[in-house]
Amino acid sequence: MLTAEDKKLIQQVWDKLQGCQEEVGAETLQRMFTTYPQTKTYFPHFDLSPGSDQIRGHGKKVVAALGTAVKSLDNLSQALSELSNLHAYNLRVDPVNFKLLAQCLQVVLATHMTKDYTPEIHAAFDKFLSAVAAVLAEKYR
């Protein structure tokens, strides 16, 4: 459960990302593919080389979906319902991958924000990304 303070911190971080979402998304995906190479199996048609148009484009989609979640912190299930359906029924992505992506996003945020990525922000974002991962995995049950 996200507290009012968590929500405030999440919104602050998201506001700071304005203008660099595509870069953050691409870096997150690239980090995931490097750190967890098994995740590449879901992208057989992608050029997985660093900075490819496909990685940048999908990274932008990932960050846009998270932006939707940030705007709907009180109703994540409804906000992410279509995305949950897509990943569960069409793409059949193993839900563990949502957590792997979340870990990679945390690292990218920390490298971009450096000292501004406080333990409080890390904790709030961890709760947020865990909630998003749980919602995306709901349809698997």
UniProtKB/Swiss-Prot annotation:
It holds the Pfam family Globin. InterPro entries: Globin, Globin-like_sf, Globin/Proto, Hemoglobin_a-typ, Hemoglobin_oxygen_transport. Keywords: Heme, Iron, Metal-binding, Oxygen transport, Transport. GO terms for molecular function: haptoglobin binding; heme binding; metal ion binding; organic acid binding; oxygen binding; oxygen carrier activity; peroxidase activity. SUPFAM superfamilies: Globin-like. GO terms for cellular component: blood microparticle; haptoglobin-hemoglobin complex; hemoglobin complex. Red blood cells. Belongs to the globin family. This is Hemoglobin subunit alpha-D.
